[in-house]
């Protein structure tokens, strides 16, 4: 059984990879801290695993190879269909259960929680069977309250614990308060949009991830 967190998002392109890299760097002192992207679409143009390792300043041994690698940057079910294949949960679970018990994992999803993996299952079903609490990557700006609260509802409908929300973009105190009070979840970090998109910028921004409490229990040494 994996220990750690599953980084999901309120949408695609909200900053899941940046949040994953920030967590990997923030908890770099934890023995056995590792990263895994179970499903990667658009592999010819986007390699999130390589990007997380680059930004976090982590070694290649700290990442597990993707369980599914698909060429087109589309929803996982559609990218798989166009590649003449399909995504099945059991092989992903076999890969997860084969990992050492003592490791701590930052697992990154693709898209949002209700993106389809196949004709029957959604990304949230993968989160559920992995048994990991979710960290939600959310935009900081207009529209994020609705998107984040919907994501929280979808996770809670499946009894998936939520470790917290990380907001990405310019600080917006009003949106932060609305998400915390109406969603009953902590905002555990606020990260700026990285400019430039460098390891130095990411590693400085990673200090915006709060240490302590549940997150330390999940990812700390």
Language-model segments: residues:
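N-terminal phosphate/diphosphate-binding loop that engages ATP/GTP or pyrophosphate donors
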Residues: 2, 18-86, 90, 94-98
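Glycine-rich phosphate-binding P-loop
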Residues: 6-21
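Short internal beta-strands
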Residues: 37, 135-138, 163-169
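Short, structured coil segments at secondary-structure junctions
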Residues: 56, 130, 182-185
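Switch II (G3) loop of P-loop NTPases
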Residues: 91-118
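Inter-motif core of Ras-like GTPase G domains
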Residues: 118-141
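C-terminal lobe/tail of nucleotide-utilizing enzymes
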Residues: 152-221
């Amino acid at each position: 059984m994996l220990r750690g967190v599953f980084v999901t998002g309120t949408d695609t392109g909200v900053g899941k990879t940046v949040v994953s890299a920030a967590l990997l760097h923030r908890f770099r002192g934890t023995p056995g801290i590792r990263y895994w992207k179970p499903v990667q679409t658009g592999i010819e143009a986007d390699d999130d695993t390589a990007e997380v390792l680059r930004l976090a300043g982590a070694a290649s041994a700290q990442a597990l190879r993707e369980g599914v690698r698909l060429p087109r940057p589309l929803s996982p079910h559609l990218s798989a269909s166009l590649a003449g294949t399909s995504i099945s949960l059991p092989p992903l679970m076999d890969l997860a259960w084969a990992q050492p018990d003592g490791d701590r994992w930052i697992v990154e999803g693709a898209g949002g929680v209700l993106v389809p993996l196949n004709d029957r299952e959604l990304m949230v079903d993968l989160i559920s069977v992995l048994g990991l609490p979710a960290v939600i990557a959310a935009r900081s700006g207009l529209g994020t309250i609705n998107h984040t609260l919907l994501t929280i509802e979808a996770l809670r409908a499946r009894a998936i614990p939520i470790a917290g929300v990380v907001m990405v973009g310019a600080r917006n105190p009003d949106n932060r308060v609305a998400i915390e009070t109406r969603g009953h979840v902590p905002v555990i970090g606020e990260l700026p949009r990285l400019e430039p998109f460098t390891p130095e910028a990411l590693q400085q921004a990673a200090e915006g991830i709060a240490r302590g409490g549940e997150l330390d229990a999940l990812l700390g040494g």
